[in-house]
């Protein structure tokens, strides 16, 4: 058994609504607003696609997801040879880490970001340098100071999970221009579709300048397919060729592939969902207490407070399950009626 596994623990999901009701003696409905899922669900066309292909369940998937690859290639205007799929971005991150890292290698990322960058590096006996956040976001200058010729991977999350903050195009361009060209920089854009900031990076365009800039995206968030597990990386043809060796032969299911294609084709539905999210998101920042809310470009808001447990329980008492962190609570933006309840709590809470 790998000794480094003693440094880690298995992923611990939050308690189910039923378990929380029992623990806190809560009556009535509970709303799961802890995992940044798209509560509107996927496009109706997804359900149609799934129903149309249920008779194919006894077949293995087509390896490499060729139908979805062609659709993504057309949607993003990138060559199919630069795309690789995983069963969610969790698997994509695992594949990249497994393909690149050897014992003693070093990755550089941020503190308070998506935990799988760290987790998979430790599994591969690599060293992890975590740079503190700056104003709730990635400190690109601080990260750059830790990157050198021997760095094996750099992980950036934009917008960042769990804080929701982002860095702009100019900042990323400047950062990439100073990273050694042989050092892969992975930009995780899981929440890309929710972004409304005009200066958000055009990472696909930056890939034309920097061969070491690699892009992650997913169908789990805005497309509403978290339960079907489809994520992908857009990278150089050479990197994809090597990482594909690590990919399990049938990692993305047939149904998942059909569903993702249907979701991708319904861009009008996606626009409607992301618009609703931005409207509801803005309501939080209208509160006088919004100074405690980090500026978000996602479908969640990070609320800073020293009284984390009290805020978590106050939101739970109005039926909203959120995600506590050491320095605050992450709230998935819900439907209007759910947000109304949370806004009432947030407007009366003592944060200090």
From Swiss-Prot:
Its cofactor is pyridoxal 5'-phosphate. PROSITE patterns: AA_TRANSFER_CLASS_2. The modification N6-(pyridoxal phosphate)lysine is found at residue 221. It catalyses: L-histidinol phosphate + 2-oxoglutarate = 3-(imidazol-4-yl)-2-oxopropyl phosphate + L-glutamate. The keyword Cell membrane does not apply. One of its GO terms (molecular function) is pyridoxal phosphate binding. Gene3D superfamilies: Aspartate Aminotransferase, domain 1, Type I PLP-dependent aspartate aminotransferase-like (Major domain). Pathway: Amino-acid biosynthesis; L-histidine biosynthesis; L-histidine from 5-phospho-alpha-D-ribose 1-diphosphate: step 7/9. The keyword Transferase applies. It comes from the Bacteria. Pfam families: Aminotran_1_2. Keywords: Amino-acid biosynthesis, Aminotransferase, Histidine biosynthesis, Pyridoxal phosphate, Transferase. GO terms for biological process: L-histidine biosynthetic process. Its EC number is 2.6.1.9. CDD domains: AAT_like. It is an enzyme of class 2 (transferase). Transmembrane segments: none annotated. Homodimer. Belongs to the class-II pyridoxal-phosphate-dependent aminotransferase family. Histidinol-phosphate aminotransferase subfamily. NCBIfam families: hisC. This is Histidinol-phosphate aminotransferase.
């Amino acid at each position: 058994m790998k000794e480094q596994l003693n440094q880690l623990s298995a992923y611990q999901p939050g308690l189910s609504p039923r378990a929380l009701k029992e623990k806190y003696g809560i009556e009535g409905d509970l709303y799961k607003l802890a995992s940044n899922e798209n509560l509107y669900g996927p496009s109706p066309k997804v359900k149609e696609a799934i129903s149309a292909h249920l008779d194919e369940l006894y077949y293995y998937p087509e390896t490499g997801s060729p139908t979805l690859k062609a659709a993504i290639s057309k949607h993003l205007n990138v060559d199919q040879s630069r795309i690789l799929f995983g069963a969610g971005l969790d698997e994509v991150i695992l594949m990249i880490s497994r393909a690149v890292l050897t014992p003693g290698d070093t990755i550089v990322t941020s503190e308070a970001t998506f935990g799988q960058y760290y987790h998979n590096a430790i599994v591969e006996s690599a060293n992890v340098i975590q740079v503190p956040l700056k104003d709730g976001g990635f400190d690109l200058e601080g990260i750059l100071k830790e990157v050198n010729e021997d760095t094996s991977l750099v992980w950036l999350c934009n917008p960042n999970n769990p804080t929701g903050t982002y860095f702009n195009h100019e900042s990323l361009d400047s950062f990439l221009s100073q990273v050694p060209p042989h050092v892969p920089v992975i930009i995780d854009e899981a929440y890309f579709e929710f972004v409304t900031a005009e200066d958000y990076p055009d990472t696909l365009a930056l890939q034309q300048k920097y061969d070491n800039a690699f892009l992650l995206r997913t169908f789990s968030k805005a497309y509403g397919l978290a339960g079907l597990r489809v994520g992908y990386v857009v990278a150089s043809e050479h990197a994809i060729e090597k990482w594909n060796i690590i990919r399990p032969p049938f990692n993305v299911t047939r149904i998942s592939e059909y569903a993702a294609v249907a979701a991708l084709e319904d861009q009008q539905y996606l626009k409607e969902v992301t618009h609703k999210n931005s409207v509801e998101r803005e309501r939080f920042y209208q509160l006088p207490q919004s100074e405690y809310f980090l500026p978000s470009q996602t479908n969640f808001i990070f609320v800073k407070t020293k009284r984390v447990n009290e805020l978590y329980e106050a939101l739970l008492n109005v039926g909203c399950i959120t995600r506590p962190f050491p320095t605050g609570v992450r709230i998935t933006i819900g439907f209007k009626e759910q947000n109304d309840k949370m806004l009432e709590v947030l407007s009366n809470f003592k944060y200090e």
